């Protein structure tokens, strides 16, 4: 995978669902599985999986498999400028719907080992 470009990151944040996923992964500061993400965003699994695939293909997310579970996280090789952009989006969405609701649902989602 080549290095993340500004247009890759623009694609990632251009869709509201992808932005919600990225904000949640950034603010949670941990890996999340698909079931945690579907519960948190209150969306169906195929929609979440489609967006996760797009983010992974662009180099924004990385995965770790643990048996049947696939855990997603922001790619640890993201350039600093990209992390700063994601931090800006996370800061800009603080206290806003649906982001606050996503975080509240995540606090009660405990499906992965």
PLM feature spans:
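Residues in the helix-turn-helix
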Residues: 47
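Histidine-centered divalent metal-coordination motifs
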Residues: 18, 50-51
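Amphipathic alpha-helical dimerization/coiled-coil segments
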Residues: 1-4, 80-113
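N-terminal helix-turn-helix DNA-binding core of bacterial DNA-binding proteins
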Residues: 2-44, 69-78
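Alpha-helical residues within the helix-turn-helix
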Residues: 39, 50, 56-57
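Beta-hairpin "wing" of winged helix-turn-helix
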Residues: 57-66, 73-74
């Amino acid at each position: 995978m080549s290095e993340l470009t500004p247009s890759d990151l623009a694609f990632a944040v251009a869709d509201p669902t992808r932005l919600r996923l990225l904000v949640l992964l950034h603010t949670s500061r941990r890996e999340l599985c698909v079931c945690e993400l579907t519960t948190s965003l209150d969306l169906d699994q195929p929609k979440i999986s489609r967006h996760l695939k797009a983010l992974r293909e662009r180099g924004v997310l990385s995965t770790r498999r643990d048996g049947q579970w696939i855990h997603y996280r922001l790619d640890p090789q993201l350039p600093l400028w990209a992390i700063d952009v994601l931090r800006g989006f996370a800061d800009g969405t603080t206290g806003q719907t649906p982001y606050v609701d996503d975080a509240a649902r995540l606090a009660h989602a405990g499906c992965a080992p």
